[in-house]
């Protein structure tokens, strides 16, 4: 640590803070009281993306959200893993929490099987979210989630880039460094009841946004006029004397 402090002082010790930087003022977005639905068209395969909003990075809700998201999906034993992907109810599905400074979101994405409608996929995903609200999950997932996150952090901190990113993310999100360091310890104290209360408040059936990516031509696409390109003579019959 002493050597690191000396290096920091050598290269950055002369920097002075800018006292005139304006403070970031965050606006509060309106609450979603009924599902917000949008259709997007294109040639790619159909899919859905669903999102629920919850408070920003400095809140206790953000820590609970990380655990809740892993209970929903962790690639192995989450609700989506066991009840949807392993049972092949859809082609594929996954979820994640995305923490931001002002407001965060829990996102679920899913791809339909052949002959399956996007609305059917939506309803299947909502069933798993309801199970989270109702506490229909193994409490052992909570300890397993924190242990996995701790292992991931230990591995990532072997990299200089990851260590630097941890500082950067803390700065961007406006979190105290002491809270960042103790985040996993606080997550280990999250209970099943905490998850249920959090999900009942933030993951309701009426406060999500959903994007239906449908296959088809986008009638509203704006075409850009292609610029005139000057032709380039390739001189295929010539050869460099240095070749």
Per-region residue spans from a language model:
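Phosphate-proximal small/polar/acidic motifs at interfaces that engage nucleotide phosphates
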Residues: 81-82
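Charge-rich, well-structured scaffold segments of protease-associated domains
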Residues: 1-20, 56, 87-242
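His/Glu-based metal-binding/catalytic segments typifying zinc-dependent metallopeptidases
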Residues: 20-77, 109, 234-243
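Beta-strand-rich C-terminal secretin pore/gate domain
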Residues: 69, 86-87
């Amino acid at each position: 640590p002493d050597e690191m402090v000396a290096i920091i002082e050598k290269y950055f010790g002369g920097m002075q803070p800018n006292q005139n930087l304006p403070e970031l003022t965050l606006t509060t977005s309106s609450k979603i009281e009924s599902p917000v639905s949008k259709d997007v068209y294109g040639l790619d395969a159909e899919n859905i993306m669903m999102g629920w909003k919850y408070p920003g990075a400095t809140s206790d809700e953000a820590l609970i959200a990380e655990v809740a998201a892993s209970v929903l999906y962790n690639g192995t034993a989450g609700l989506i893993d066991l009840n949807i992907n392993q049972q092949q109810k859809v082609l594929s599905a996954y979820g994640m929490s995305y923490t931001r400074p002002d407001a965060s979101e829990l996102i679920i994405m899913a791809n339909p099987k052949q002959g399956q409608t996007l609305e059917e996929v939506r309803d299947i995903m909502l069933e798993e979210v309801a199970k989270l609200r109702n506490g229909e999950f193994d409490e052992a997932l909570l300890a397993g989630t924190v242990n996995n996150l701790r292992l991931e952090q230990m591995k990532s901190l072997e990299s200089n880039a990851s260590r630097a990113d941890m500082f950067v993310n803390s700065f961007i999100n406006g979190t105290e460094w002491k809270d960042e360091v103790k985040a996993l310890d606080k997550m280990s104290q999250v209970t099943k009841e905490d998850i249920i209360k959090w999900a009942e408040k933030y993951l309701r059936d009426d406060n999500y946004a959903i994007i239906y990516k449908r296959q088809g031509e986008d009638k509203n696409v704006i075409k850009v006029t292609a610029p005139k390109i000057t032709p380039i003579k390739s001189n295929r019959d010539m050869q460099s004397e240095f070749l």
